[in-house]
């Protein structure tokens, strides 16, 4: 099986459509379908900050749950939106406010449909995907070699948030260790979460979050070819979001 793994979309539907067309998908049925049966895989954070979060929920639900032709691994923004939809007390900030505003503008019956679709998508998707006979891992923020196969709380925190130290940067964002430098596994780990200006290959890991929602690019990785394909963002460039990884 051949896959096209898509970085953090964050509600950037137009960039997602542009990227999938560039990857050879057609949209004749209002969904990206590849003529050679390649499958899309999403590294999570499909919503928040960008203009079309609900459209992305509907597309990913349709591909993953209804048609079963794609894979989705949730990100930290997905986890927070899931908790919001469950009625938990979450802070509506850091991008969630844009998704909530879209949601609250809908009539109640459409709100219920979107909520049910996202809850189903989240609950029926694993924390990370192990594909191609264990040669490929698709996850949100990365995974240590010794965590592969585990689902416990420590692994969940790592996969959703990265290798956080507990410290904070001046802007309040968490300080993260560069786990990829220590990765010695043979499986390719394809992930996102931390915006980088260019796809970052370190050992057998690839970070494909090129900051589409921050004016960078939306990137896909073609597997097993290991080629990256990107399209430019239509949004303003926010340089401080592309912090050096340390």
Curated annotation (Swiss-Prot):
GO-annotated cellular components: cytoplasm
Cofactor dependence: Ni(2+)
Keyword GTP-binding tagged: yes
Molecular function via GO: bis(5'-nucleosyl)-tetraphosphatase (asymmetrical) activity; GTP binding; nickel cation binding; phosphatase activity
Enzyme Commission number, as recorded: 3.6.1.17
CDD domains xrefs: MPP_Prp_like
Catalytic activity: P(1),P(4)-bis(5'-guanosyl) tetraphosphate + H2O = GMP + GTP + 2 H(+)
Keywords: GTP-binding, Hydrolase, Nickel, Nucleotide-binding
InterPro entries referenced in this protein's UniProt entry, alphabetically: Ap4A_hydrolase, Bis(5'-nucleosyl)-tetraP_PrpE, Calcineurin-like_PHP_ApaH, Metallo-depent_PP-like, MPP_PrpE-like
Pfam families in the cross-refs: Metallophos
Domain of life: Bacteria
Database matches in PANTHER family: BIS(5'-NUCLEOSYL)-TETRAPHOSPHATASE PRPE [ASYMMETRICAL] (PTHR42850:SF7), METALLOPHOSPHOESTERASE (PTHR42850)
Function per UniProt: Asymmetrically hydrolyzes Ap4p to yield AMP and ATP.
Family (UniProt): Belongs to the PrpE family.
Protein name stated in the entry: Bis(5'-nucleosyl)-tetraphosphatase PrpE [asymmetrical]
């Amino acid at each position: 099986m051949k896959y096209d793994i898509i970085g953090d979309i964050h509600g950037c539907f137009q960039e997602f459509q542009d990227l999938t067309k560039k990857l050879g998908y057609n949209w004749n049925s209002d969904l990206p379908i590849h003529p050679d049966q390649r499958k899309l895989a999403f590294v999570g954070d499909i919503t928040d900050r960008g203009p079309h979060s609900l459209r992305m929920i509907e597309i990913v639900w349709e591909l993953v749950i209804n048609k079963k032709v794609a894979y989705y691994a949730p990100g930290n923004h997905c986890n927070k939106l899931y908790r919001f939809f469950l009625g938990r007390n979450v802070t509506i900030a850091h991008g969630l406010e844009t998704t909530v505003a879209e949601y609250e503008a809908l009539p109640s019956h459409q709100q219920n449909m979107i909520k049910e679709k996202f809850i189903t998508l989240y609950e029926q998707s694993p924390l990370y995907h192990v594909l191609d006979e264990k040669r490929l891992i698709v996850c949100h923020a990365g995974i240590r070699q010794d965590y592969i196969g585990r689902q416990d709380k420590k692994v969940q925190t790592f996969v959703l948030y990265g290798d956080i130290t507990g410290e904070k940067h001046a802007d309040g964002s968490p300080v993260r260790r560069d786990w990829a430098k220590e990765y010695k596994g043979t499986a390719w780990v394809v992930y996102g979460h931390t915006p980088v200006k260019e796809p970052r290959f370190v050992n057998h890991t690839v970070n494909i979050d090129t900051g589409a929602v921050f004016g960078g690019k939306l990137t896909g990785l073609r597997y097993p070819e290991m080629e990256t394909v990107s399209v430019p963002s239509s949004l303003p460039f926010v340089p401080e979001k592309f912090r050096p990884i340390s």
